[in-house]
């Protein structure tokens, strides 16, 4: 049977949703693993990652059930939701690739001062740095309370802002690239669902509508 047929479209849509399910379970597992090992203490970060994983899992399950049963309503809502996710993810991915170091520094600086003291302390110890940028009157206060190892090994510690900028630049490029890749898989999912939804099941009653 040619790949444009009913069976091939069904199998392709099922395979795509199985991949989405694996990715969602991976997100949930990594978040739980990070929390269990104490790598990330912020419940907001953990909750956000798990929420994204659960949302993706629900979409994948809906798409898989719709594909297996050729369910018109499920496939319709699957297309709509996946299309909206594509638009949102495409915009975010392009923003990640377009943001410059100056904007990154502004975001890091704004985020730093809304963090709790515990979170800042954990970041300083994890990255072995003290303070953010030596541009504010609070930098010296941060430096005085810093518990990073570098403080006891050398007269001065590298500023956390410099390290954050280095890692954030790399992370944004990776996130933007991966996000764009998944954006195009979502467009593929919308196209497959639309095509499959309009195909007639060869096993169905010939007189039935679709």
From Swiss-Prot:
Keyword field: Glycoprotein, Membrane, Transmembrane, Transmembrane helix
Originating gene: TSPAN31
Topology Extracellular: residue spans: 34-44, 94-173
InterPro entries the UniProt entry points to: Tetraspanin/Peripherin, Tetraspanin_animals
Pfam families per record: Tetraspanin
Cytoplasmic-side positions: 1-12, 66-72, 195-210
Organism: Pongo abelii (Sumatran orangutan)
Localization per record: Membrane
Glycan-modified residues: 100, 109, 117, 134
Protein's name in the database: Tetraspanin-31
Membrane topology type: Multi-pass membrane protein
Top-level lineage group: Eukaryota
A cellular component annotation (GO) from this entry: membrane
Chain ranges passing through the membrane: 13-33, 45-65, 73-93, 174-194
Chief localisation class: membrane
Family: Belongs to the tetraspanin (TM4SF) family.
Protein's UniProt keywords contain NAD: no
């Amino acid at each position: 049977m040619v790949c444009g047929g009913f069976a091939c479209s069904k199998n392709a849509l099922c395979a795509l949703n199985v991949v989405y399910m694996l990715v969602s379970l991976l997100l949930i597992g990594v978040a739980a693993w990070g929390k269990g090992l104490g790598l990330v203490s912020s419940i907001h970060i953990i909750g956000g990652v798990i929420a994204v994983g659960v949302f993706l899992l629900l979409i994948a399950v809906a798409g898989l059930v719709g594909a297996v049963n050729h369910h018109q309503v499920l496939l319709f809502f699957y297309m709509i939701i996946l299309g909206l996710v594509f638009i949102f993810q495409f915009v975010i991915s392009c923003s990640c690739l377009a943001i410059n170091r100056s904007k990154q520094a502004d975001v890091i600086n704004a985020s730093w001062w809304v963090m709790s003291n515990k979170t800042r302390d954990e970041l300083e110890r994890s990255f072995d740095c003290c303070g953010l940028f030596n541009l504010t009157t609070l930098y010296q206060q941060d430096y005085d309370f810093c518990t990073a190892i570098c403080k006891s090994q050398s007269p001065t510690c590298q500023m956390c802002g410099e390290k954050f900028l280095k890692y954030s630049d790399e992370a944004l490029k990776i996130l933007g690239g991966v996000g764009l890749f998944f954006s195009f898989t979502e467009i593929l999912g919308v196209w497959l669902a639309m095509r499959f939804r309009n195909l007639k099941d060869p096993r169905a009653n010939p007189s039935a509508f679709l």
